[in-house]
Amino acid sequence: MNAPISAAPVVTAGSVRFGNQLPLAVIAGPCQLESRGHALEVASALKEIATRLNISLVYKTSFDKANRTSGSAARGLGLAQSLPIFAEIRSSLGLPVLTDVHDASQCAEVAQAVDILQIPAFLCRQTDLLLAAAATGKVVNVKKGQFLAPWDMANVVAKITGAGNPNVLATERGVSFGYNTLISDMRSLPIMAKTTGAPVIFDATHSVQQPGGQGTSSGGQREFVPVLARAAVAVGVAGVFIETHPDPDHAPSDGPNMVPLAQFEGLLRTLMAFDALAKGQAADAIR
């Protein structure tokens, strides 16, 4: 059975190819960059898993969580300390790296050390930020704002492609549904693919976030990550975005919605099976 999602140009980041009808790719890593040692530990573990499963992997982490609920919350190592770590992960492990940018002034410098610049959902309509990211020529992954309809992403993506950069990914990460709650409308995946012409990614961990749900921090329901991820992959997406951590309950941010690293490989095996079915691959490709 062919996937209902529209084909799109293939976007390449390092050795990873994203396409709505290509085999599933994964973007994974901890929410924020906690230390060099922690980053290399998690990146190495993820590379081993990806190699065993023969799945393409981009490592993600954030140098600055600039939109934390509380002003006193941990934000990450910051730009100066993080860029050498990103470069080391790329050179020593051979993994493409993704990180967020929050201001137009950051884009050119960050682009020297990573493969994908990510635009946070809250900032997805900030034209100057989008244009600065586009100007780097790097792949730009735009998170759909929790306040946007899926078809509204067409204008967002057009700002980047109109600036001469065709290397865009569009990511669904849930839509606001009342206070402290997000829901995922799986119709948005084929709608975004059709209206933006971009490979579509599903963010399975931020989609179960409960924004501000713990007063001074966001809550989450990580037990529903596999449920939503399976549903999205069954539609037929280019990739999944999954935050993972060796000890989520003691992570400095987004712990309630991150997948424990020990459970990550099992989840990926399941998603690869769903992906093979959704994209009409031979049954013997499912294992």
Curated annotation (Swiss-Prot):
Q: Say where the protein is mainly found.
A: cytoplasm
Q: What class of enzyme is it?
A: transferase
Q: Which reaction does it catalyse?
A: D-arabinose 5-phosphate + phosphoenolpyruvate + H2O = 3-deoxy-alpha-D-manno-2-octulosonate-8-phosphate + phosphate
Instruction: Supply one GO CC term from the record.
Output: cytoplasm
Mind telling me which Gene3D superfamilies this protein's record contains? Aldolase class I
Q: Which domain of life is it from?
A: Bacteria
Pathway it acts in? Answer: Carbohydrate biosynthesis; 3-deoxy-D-manno-octulosonate biosynthesis; 3-deoxy-D-manno-octulosonate from D-ribulose 5-phosphate: step 2/3; Bacterial outer membrane biogenesis; lipopolysaccharide biosynthesis
Keyword Secreted included in the entry's annotation: no
Q: Which GO terms describe its molecular function?
A: 3-deoxy-8-phosphooctulonate synthase activity
Asked if the keyword Lyase belongs to this entry, the reply reads: no
The record's subcellular location field reads: Cytoplasm
Name the UniProt key words of this record, in alphabetical order. Answer: Cytoplasm, Lipopolysaccharide biosynthesis, Transferase
Q: HAMAP family this protein is in?
A: KDO8P_synth (MF_00056)
Family (UniProt): Belongs to the KdsA family.
- Record protein name field: 2-dehydro-3-deoxyphosphooctonate aldolase
